[in-house]
């Protein structure tokens, strides 16, 4: 799921009224502020795309796959409203991704990167492989695949190319990559770009490189760590102190929800009742992170304003607090 687009409301100029979207947007704006809505829309849309890419690539990595059905390319206004589409309910673009970018991981031919992780230590060896999912009607013969590992600013950290053959209708092993990552004392956000020369087929993957630090030095003694909210913490803050509140797992059992990295599926209220009736755990219903990426806290942890794979372990092991 993602937040609905405010721009979609303008498309209803006839007898139809998007009451469902109006109600949802009104609730969010009243709670979070109208001026902040676009930030939440962008963050939830980015996470939804990240999850779609992972799901579709997972299927393409399946040998002898006959095909798949995507649920759904567009939003579904029934069943309580499922804002799950890359397009809105009117089959119009939401402006969250271009057709060209979407095809980079959902075309008749897709280059795939297979690795054990998205996060690595500086100076380590990145062992991975590239496969080609060729569902076109044409064999790729003696084609050239180019790859490059680029920094966030576009600098090439490593690159190479190789020849490949990818018969139509199958998943082909193209090449094993062994990349020695650069030594660095500062965390790097990188992008692995792969493309087949002379074609429109390309793909890219985010990954992160961190200094191999065995022990963390305390750089600022005036930042204290607290495991629960207390009078001591309150007085410390009122006196001008800086603190990080990292509650213990069982500190606030009635004010926490489970850590969920992926966006909520389809419609929360619908599957909440289904889960309760089946006596199954109910999803937290969360929609990912909205991050102040420029905060000094992230000087050594490069991040966008939305969830990405470097957050996986932290989110899965978290106990988010309900603050309102």
Regions found by a protein language model. Give the residues of each.
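Substrate-binding clefts and catalytic carboxylate motifs of secreted carbohydrate-active enzymes
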Residues: 1-141
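Beta-sheet entry/capping signal
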Residues: 65-69, 223, 242-243
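C-terminal edge beta-strand
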Residues: 162, 205-207
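A glycine-rich, often tryptophan-bearing local segment used as a flexible ligand/cofactor-contacting loop or short
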Residues: 228-314
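Short, exposed coil/turn segments at beta-strand boundaries within extracellular/luminal domains
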Residues: 198-203
